[in-house]
């Protein structure tokens, strides 16, 4: 395979003075025979034959063309076709005249166009003796045969990627994904230092050298590339001694690597802490996923890390296992993972103890020891989503909101504040838009909104999400400006956010409305003590500062 990343410069006659002005491009939908101006310097393009697809080459790509160049009087001065030899150059690098750089980047594969290039974008006042006179306008009949993308993927010149075979679709692997690749790594003299006909690794963990992980993140499935790798992305200043089948890499050696991304398994990190890992073994259908409250049908096999099977449901002669999400029917990690799956998907889910059986032993088909990480293979056979607001009429929305509120209350009493918060959020969403409600329905809706947002604010305070607690209380006060609970809870949130002035405003207003409220009075007392303490600290700080400013220096004392 050709390892050369230096693109041929072509005939001397074709060399330009610089990269040129890249303004302007082909307008959309040019028809055969139509002529358009590109940019504002007089470059014209006439379409002779349409190309394929929509892609056009980019700056840095190696393009391959056939061309015939003529003066305006029709006199031919050069032709690759006459030589039966295609011409290659690197687009946008000043290897050709400016008119070529600007014009060819508007072409599609297989396209044939006639470019009329003014002197300013060709050879100018000097011309190119003896064939091209000074100030000559030139015409080039150009056919774009193909191009090869060359990308500086590290953005520092450390890794250049040349695409040899385009991949499928548009997705690229991410850090958590497991990729399967084939590669051959060589020194610049062609010595093979490492080779594999198939190896799997997690992108963020890397393999062989840093260049492989960086490269695969830019590749599509089935893509084949040639990498030119500087030492900092290879084996660095130290190099590598020979080991097993791997050859030695000298210090500060550059590498050339053939790399093919055969496939990869998508790994999703679930949850704010990203501790639940879902690896897709079989892709699913469509884009729909279950929502909270959906009834799902699954096949599951639960294993310990040593491979011991402790649970198997829905396989062989068994009916598929059915449960309702977000109802604690299964362990939390499995519940969360299923919410991230599509119908027909098969996934391997790795769940740490805090989202599995915790620090207690669990007796299943086999014993799950305390603090065990468990692994589930899950197939989502089907699901029926819980109804959303748009699925319901007005009376059903109010009824559903009331039901979710009661579910939230039960969860709150059990100390399950995060799950309770979600119930209150869903209840509020059912009645968020009430413009079509009757007057009686609007009254019910208003009261439900107040209750759900107040209760949710209580959840957020328990969860230490003080900013959200403040926002929820503000929503309540927009509906009922004299709501004591909303003022009281917002004051609590402001206090935790160290905004004591706003907290004092709210608590004073709450006391004006309900002077005998014990909780409000106690909170006001605590708040005043905090403010007093802060004022004391501030006074001491400023006193010390002013004392330093007014204290005479040693020289002044002597005087």
From Swiss-Prot:
Its catalytic activity? [protein]-peptidylproline (omega=180) = [protein]-peptidylproline (omega=0)
This protein's GO cellular component annotations are: cytoplasm
The EC category is: isomerase
Q: Give the Enzyme Commission number.
A: 5.2.1.8
Q: What residue stretches are annotated with the PPIase FKBP-type domain?
A: 60-148, 176-265, 293-384
Which residues lie in Gly residues bias regions?
17-27
Q: Which Gene3D superfamilies match?
A: 3.10.50.40, Tetratricopeptide repeat domain
GO MF terms, alphabetically ordered? calmodulin binding; peptidyl-prolyl cis-trans isomerase activity
Keywords (A to Z) from UniProt:
Calmodulin-binding, Isomerase, Repeat, Rotamase, Stress response, TPR repeat
Pfam families listed in its UniProt record? FKBP_C, TPR_1
Q: What does this protein do?
A: PPIases accelerate the folding of proteins during protein synthesis.
PANTHER family cross-referenced by the UniProt entry: PEPTIDYLPROLYL ISOMERASE
Query: What is the protein name for this chain?
Result: 70 kDa peptidyl-prolyl isomerase
Query: Which organism is this entry from?
Result: Triticum aestivum
